[in-house]
Amino acid sequence: PVDIDRYDFIRLGVKERWAVLLPAEDPLVQKGFVTAADLVGKELLFPARLKVQNELVSWFGDYFPQVRVPYTCNMSTNASIMVRNGLGYAFHIEGSRPFLDRSQVCSLPLYPELAATTVLAWKKRQPFSVTTTKFIEFAKNFVKTYNNREQ
């Protein structure tokens, strides 16, 4: 979820899945995905943004009162280090995982899937240079063409 109230934006149409970073030796790795029930009793690292936290709480449903969220973290690099050092399981967008040793930290998608869409955003009523204006026009046309091709 993105707070776009103060911004003009283009929705890029790319779906990004949420996933969990966990220690590579965790038995859940063999399962290939993570459910809310799998995370009961685990210490979790949530993203710091409240809108994202609300999405995750909703995904957990009735299981949420049974989990602990002692930490928040905005950077997947920091989250990976915290997971590697045994501080918990971290939520992140699949593919945002930094270049750490995969033999220490793994990423598994959530099931049921929780997805977000990406936006390209810029401040409303902002004067832009010619270059920036041309870039925004290009991006709008590109996304429109791309989305029409995907349908």
Regions found by a protein language model. Give the residues of each.
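Short coil/turn segments
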Residues: P1-V2, R17-W18, P23-F33, E43-Q53, ...
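Beta-alpha-beta core module
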Residues: D3-R11, K15-R17, G32, D38, ...
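Secondary-structure junction motif
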Residues: K42-F64, F128-V130, I136, V143-E150
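Short beta-strand-to-loop elements that line the ligand-binding cleft
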Residues: F46, P65-N78
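Hydrophobic alpha-helical segments typical of transmembrane helices
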Residues: E55-L56, N78, A116, T131
